[in-house]
């Protein structure tokens, strides 16, 4: 690369096809020359478009020549789109070289080097300053790849592994417009160059590995996953071992990264595509999701619940039996979550007909797991909407198998009584310990230094248990009431929070006088 400052110009010129820095010239339109000269003029225009301009430090420099290049690119896009037999063998190296000169560059430093989660609604992406030219170069190259005249056997000499590697590096661009073009370009190359397919998959794997285990920052993960979704869809059956390893060792660990929300829809699609291809992968996939389940990130939990429902929508009944117990133990925890969106999303599973049919076939295993969590939270959860959803789930369980529901009720009641007896025994043990302590001559000395209190029996696990018949009636009534949705007719009103008042603070505020009030009192 050489920088040309001649005549005040700030162009950066590619020297590979020229004898040094030069000013661009306005060439004739390709349509205005005889057919015999069109190929030569086409090559001249491609070389002319290898001149790079400064759009960053001085956007107003070389405006005339920037427009000349833009017009040349637009003309070439039109030319190869509407004409046949114009992509001759000498054109291939010129097109690939022009694309490489314009596109393969060092990306600017990230505007978000800490790797915090990008929020599309709040954060503005950093846009590429030279986009007026880059967009047309991408459009031209795509039309070149998609042309009926394009011959991969000729192009493979120029579009090779080095070219693909440089193309993949551009996926870290912060400009979403560029990543969108890159996604389409790479997909076309993958489709046309069979010899590059394994290499492309391998290099995408490497990008994912670096992202998961080293940087946790890359702008193009969603776009790469979107390409992979299409690739996975085309995998032949039975799946190769390398594809299964890719799912288990590359795709599933992507769930660990904190910026999951940026690419989760594309990731979930890839996972579900694999399960539709091979249902035997269901157990390792679900167990991996349960292993990576978020502990303190509620929005991420909602994403996991969304993905699990997508998996359950395509699961085979024989595979469901293998994962139902650990899965519903996790769902029971989600129903108990104080974050209402997590509890709500988990309870929406009971609105899915296919999932309900799977639950119905295996109710004897699932209901005993879910019942304690559903019952406890039917009264103690702070969000009233959750109460209605829980009663709906209990009602469905009750209609599914009345005897099993009653058995679970009695079993839960017995366990509650056991817990109360155990608590009572603990209280009595503490009373004995305290009485023994009182018998010690030095008790009065130590009792003044520390205050001891007898443990109070606390109901920490839900309300006192109703009678079975009463529970049935309560569940039916509450589920019916929840379906009515009384909030529907109420006008929307924002509820104001009421902060608990400390009496000492309140008294101090009432007694407080501002400085000007004190001054006026002194003046009197």
Curated annotation (Swiss-Prot):
The keyword Lipid metabolism does not apply. One of its GO terms (molecular function) is protein phosphatase activator activity. A motif (Nuclear localization signal) lies at residues 416-422. It holds the Pfam family B56. It comes from the Eukaryota. The keyword Ribonucleoprotein does not apply. One of its GO terms (biological process) is meiotic sister chromatid cohesion. It is found in: Nucleus; Chromosome, Centromere. Residues 476-509 are annotated as: Disordered. Keywords: Acetylation, Centromere, Chromosome, Nucleus, Phosphoprotein. Induction: Up-regulated upon DNA damage. SUPFAM superfamilies: ARM repeat (SSF48371). The modification N-acetylmethionine is found at residue 1. GO terms for cellular component: chromosome, centromeric region; cytosol; Golgi apparatus; nucleoplasm; nucleus; protein phosphatase type 2A complex. Highest levels in heart, skeletal muscle and brain. Lower levels in pancreas, kidney, lung and placenta. Very low levels in liver. InterPro entries: ARM-like, ARM-type_fold, PP2A_B56. Isoform Gamma-3 is phosphorylated on serine residues. Isoform Gamma-1 phosphorylation by ERK2 is IER3-dependent and inhibits ERK dephosphorylation by PP2A-PPP2R5C. PP2A consists of a common heterodimeric core enzyme, composed of PPP2CA a 36 kDa catalytic subunit (subunit C) and PPP2R1A a 65 kDa constant regulatory subunit (PR65 or subunit A), that associates with a variety of regulatory subunits. Proteins that associate with the core dimer include three families of regulatory subunits B (the R2/B/PR55/B55, R3/B''/PR72/PR130/PR59 and R5/B'/B56 families), the 48 kDa variable regulatory subunit, viral proteins, and cell signaling molecules. Interacts with PPP2CA and PPP2R1A; the interaction is direct. Interacts with SGO1; the interaction is direct. Belongs to the phosphatase 2A regulatory subunit B56 family. The B regulatory subunit might modulate substrate selectivity and catalytic activity, and might also direct the localization of the catalytic enzyme to a particular subcellular compartment. The PP2A-PPP2R5C holoenzyme may specifically dephosphorylate and activate TP53 and play a role in DNA damage-induced inhibition of cell proliferation. PP2A-PPP2R5C may also regulate the ERK signaling pathway through ERK dephosphorylation. This is Serine/threonine-protein phosphatase 2A 56 kDa regulatory subunit gamma isoform. It comes from Homo sapiens.
């Amino acid at each position: 690369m050489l920088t040309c400052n001649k005549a005040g110009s700030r162009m950066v010129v590619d020297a590979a096809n020229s004898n040094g820095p030069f000013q661009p010239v306005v060439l004739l339109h390709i349509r205005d020359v005889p057919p015999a000269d069109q190929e030569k003029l086409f090559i001249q225009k491609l070389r002319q478009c290898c001149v790079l301009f400064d759009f960053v430090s001085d956007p107003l420099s070389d405006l005339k020549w920037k427009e000349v290049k833009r017009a040349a690119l637009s003309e070439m896009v039109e030319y190869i789109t509407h004409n046949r037999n114009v992509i001759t063998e000498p054109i291939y190296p010129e097109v690939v070289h022009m694309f490489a000169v314009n596109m393969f560059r060092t990306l600017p430093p990230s505007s978000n080097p800490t790797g915090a989660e990008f929020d599309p609604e709040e954060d503005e992406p950093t846009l590429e300053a030279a986009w007026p030219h880059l967009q047309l170069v991408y459009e031209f190259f795509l039309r070149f790849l998609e042309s009926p005249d394009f011959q991969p056997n000729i192009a493979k000499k120029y579009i090779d592994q080095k070219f693909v590697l440089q193309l993949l590096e551009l996926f870290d661009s912060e400009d979403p417009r560029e990543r969108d073009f890159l996604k389409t370009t790479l997909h076309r190359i993958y489709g046309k160059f069979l010899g590059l397919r394994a290499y492309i998959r391998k290099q995408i794997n490497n990008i994912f590995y670096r992202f998961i285990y080293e940087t946790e920052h890359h702008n193009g993960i969603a776009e790469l996953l979107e390409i992979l979704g299409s690739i996975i869809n085309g995998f032949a059956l039975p799946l190769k071992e390398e594809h299964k390893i890719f799912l288990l060792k590359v795709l599933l660990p992507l769930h660990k990264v904190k910026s999951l929300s940026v690419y989760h829809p594309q990731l979930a699609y890839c996972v579900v595509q694999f399960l539709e291809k091979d249902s035997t992968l269901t157990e390792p996939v679900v167990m991996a999701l349960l292993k990576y389940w978020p502990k303190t990130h509620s929005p991420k939990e909602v994403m996991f619940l969304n993905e699990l429902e997508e998996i359950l929508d395509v699961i085979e009944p024989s595979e469901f039996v293998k994962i139902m117990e650990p899965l519903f133990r996790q769902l029971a925890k989600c129903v108990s979550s104080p974050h209402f969106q997590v509890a709500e999303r988990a309870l929406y599973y009971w609105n899915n007909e296919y999932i309900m049919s799977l639950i119905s076939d295996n109710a004897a295993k699932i209901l005993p797991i879910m019942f304690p969590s559903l019952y406890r939270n039917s009264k103690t959860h702070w969000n009233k909407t959750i109460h209605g959803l829980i009663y709906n789930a209990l009602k469905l369980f009750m209609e599914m198998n009345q005897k099993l529901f009653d058995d679970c009720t009695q079993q839960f009641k017995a366990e509650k009584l056991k817990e109360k007896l155990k608590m009572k025994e603990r209280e009595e043990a503490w009373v004995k310990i305290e009485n023994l302590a009182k018998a010690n001559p030095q008790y009065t000395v130590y009792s003044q230094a520390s205050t001891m209190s007898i443990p109070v029996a606390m109901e920490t696990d839900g309300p006192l248990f109703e009678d079975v018949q009463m529970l049935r009636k309560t569940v039916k009534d509450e589920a019916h009431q929840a379906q009515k949705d009384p909030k529907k007719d109420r006008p929307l009103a924002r509820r104001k929070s009421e902060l608990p008042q400390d009496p000492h603070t309140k008294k101090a505020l009432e007694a407080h006088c501002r400085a000007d009030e004190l001054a006026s009192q002194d003046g009197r």
